[in-house]
């Protein structure tokens, strides 16, 4: 399965009538492996900040998490494994795997729990497969 098919079939799929607004799989180096058409253009420094927070959990909390120029307030995640952010009625979940970042962006009516499930389940699978 291609990385694009993974984004299309596993991240942008329907869950209880809702979809993510955007999703991507990005390498730790910031190279996009695959993304939805709606995924924002990310800046290298944004990926660097995210990777730093995985290595030093809590480092993004004072400044916020930036993705495609949009600022998210960092909320409780899983240190070193998952970063979650909130902005108004939506937010973002980022799951770190061995080689990549699985990113899902959502807006209401999707719930944070639905976003977490869509992002973390395939992320766990990729971890098991060594990706």
UniProtKB/Swiss-Prot annotation:
Cellular compartments annotated: Cytoplasm, Cytoskeleton
Q: Which cellular component terms (GO) are annotated to the entry? A: cell cortex; cytoskeleton
**Keywords assigned by UniProt, alphabetized:** Actin-binding, Allergen, Cytoplasm, Cytoskeleton
Q: Does the keyword Ligase apply?
A: no
Q: Which Pfam families match?
A: Profilin
* Molecular function terms from GO: actin monomer binding
Q: Which InterPro entries match?
A: PFN, PFN_euk, PFN_sf, Profilin_CS
- Membrane-crossing segments per the record: none
- Secreted among keywords: no
Q: Tell me how this protein assembles.
A: Occurs in many kinds of cells as a complex with monomeric actin in a 1:1 ratio.
| Family, as annotated | Belongs to the profilin family.
Relate the protein's function as given in its record.
Answer: Binds to actin and affects the structure of the cytoskeleton. At high concentrations, profilin prevents the polymerization of actin, whereas it enhances it at low concentrations. By binding to PIP2, it inhibits the formation of IP3 and DG.
Its protein name is: Profilin-1
């Amino acid at each position: 399965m291609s990385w694009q098919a993974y984004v299309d079939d596993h991240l942008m799929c329907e869950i209880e009538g809702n979809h993510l607004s955007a999703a991507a799989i990005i390498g730790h180096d910031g190279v996009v492996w695959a993304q939805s058409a709606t995924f924002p253009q990310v800046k290298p420094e944004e990926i660097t900040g995210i990777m730093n927070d995985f290595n030093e959990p809590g480092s993004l909390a004072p400044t916020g998490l930036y993705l495609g120029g949009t600022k998210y307030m960092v909320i409780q995640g899983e240190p070193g494994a998952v970063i979650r952010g909130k902005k108004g009625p939506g937010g973002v979940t980022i799951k770190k795997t061995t080689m990549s970042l699985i990113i899902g962006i959502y807006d209401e009516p999707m719930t944070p729990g639905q976003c977490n499930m869509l992002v973390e389940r395939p992320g766990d699978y990729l971890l098991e497969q060594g990706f």
